[in-house]
Design a protein with these regions (language model features):
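Eukaryotic N-terminal targeting leaders
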Residues: 1-3
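Non-heme Fe(II) oxygenase catalytic core, chiefly the N-lobe of the double-stranded beta-helix
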Residues: 8-11, 16-19, 28-224, 237-246, ...
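Generic N-terminal leader segments that precede the first folded domain
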Residues: 21-23
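Short His-Asn-centered micro-motif
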Residues: 25-26, 125, 230-232
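Non-heme Fe(II)/2-oxoglutarate
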Residues: 46, 174-188, 210, 223-320
Length: 320
């Protein structure tokens, strides 16, 4: 008997297993989005009506407030539970979303452009999770999530993904049970002796190099309230905003209480993410065991966003 899900339709399940992502349309309301973005421009220190004040092309903003996903976007929360095998597997600390907006404003030069960069040649390809050592079964980043807070049209700075890149990353991580460290747009084996020249390690991985092997690319255009849910190993990149219509998204992580399990006794207990990983590897099951201790990293962005938060709080106080 086919497994039943709280929210996902058979078509959505099939799409996720084939392509590694699904889009939940209208997962939260325009009113909710408007409430959360009401002070966006004050926080940025920019004027929405004066592009000369848009001095940064892309801004990763700090978080000021959070809300349970269950109340903010009930449909997305139901889909997240379906993808990860049930609410009991999800880390309760990863069940909130915040207002840490990622804003893509473009530039004057891009607005005048007549030629556009091919997705394969974009310069920001990566997998998420700059705060931990990566293993195939890492629980810290169990899904890649993109809630959309502004309408995003073609060439308007949408996130691009590469569904066939997921297979490359999965196989790479399966071959590196020692874990790999995310550094800029690369992955470096955690036990490498080549600390000063990591690119000399046979296990060195460059996202910008490996993306050249990919042929499938999807531009995540959408409308306010849409939420894209992706496999955690989905290669993705920011794109250029040629339209200069402000693009606003967030990128909240979802964590698990325990690592993914690719060798369950009952095959019916595999989550959809686990099933997609196994499919990417071309196997029915896999006994994966990390050979080094799991550990977290404090990324440089944390310090940067703390400074940004203090600056934003000052602007908000001055507004009042």
């Amino acid at each position: 008997m086919p497994k039943t899900y709280e929210y996902l339709s058979p078509e959505q399940v099939a799409h996720f297993l084939e392509h590694g992502y699904i889009i939940i349309k209208g997962a939260f309301s325009e009113e909710k989005a408007a409430q959360w973005t009401a002070n966006l421009w004050v926080r940025l220190g920019m004027d929405p009506g004066d592009k000369t004040t848009w001095t940064r092309e892309r801004v990763h903003m700090p978080v000021h407030k959070r809300e349970l996903v269950e109340t903010f976007a009930p449909k997305a929360w139901a889909a997240i539970k379906d993808l990860l095998g049930g609410e009991e597997r999800i880390d309760e600390h990863a069940s909130t979303w915040g207002d840490s907006f990622i804003v893509n404003l473009g530039t004057d030069e891009l607005e005048k452009a007549t030629e556009f960069v091919h997705p394969r040649d974009m310069d920001n390809w990566h997998v998420d999770g700059d705060f931990f050592i990566h293993y195939l079964d890492s629980p810290e980043q169990a899904l890649l999530v993109v809630p959309i807070f502004s309408n995003i049209a073609h060439n308007g700075g949408a996130t691009y993904i590469s569904p066939d890149g997921l297979e490359l990353i999965a196989r790479y991580l399966a071959e590196h049970p020692e874990g790999v460290t995310p550094v800029d747009l690369t992955l470096i084996p955690s036990t490498t002796p080549h600390t000063s020249n990591p690119e000399q390690d046979p296990g060195f991985w460059s996202h910008l190099k490996e993306i050249k092997r990919c042929s499938k690319f999807v531009e995540l255009t959408g409308e306010v309230g849409d939420v894209v849910l992706m496999h955690p190993l989905m290669l993705h990149t920011a794109s250029k905003n040629y339209l200069r219509v402000p693009r606003v998204i967030t990128n909240p992580p979802v964590g698990l209480k325990q690592p993914f399990n690719f060798n369950r006794e009952d095959e019916g207990e595999y989550s959809l993410v686990e099933r997609k990983t196994l499919r990417a590897l071309g196997v029915d099951r896999l006994e994966f065991r990390p050979t080094t201790e799991r550990r977290r990293i404090v990324p440089e962005r944390v310090k940067i966003q703390e400074r940004m938060k203090q600056e934003e709080e000052t602007r908000l106080r001055n507004l009042n």
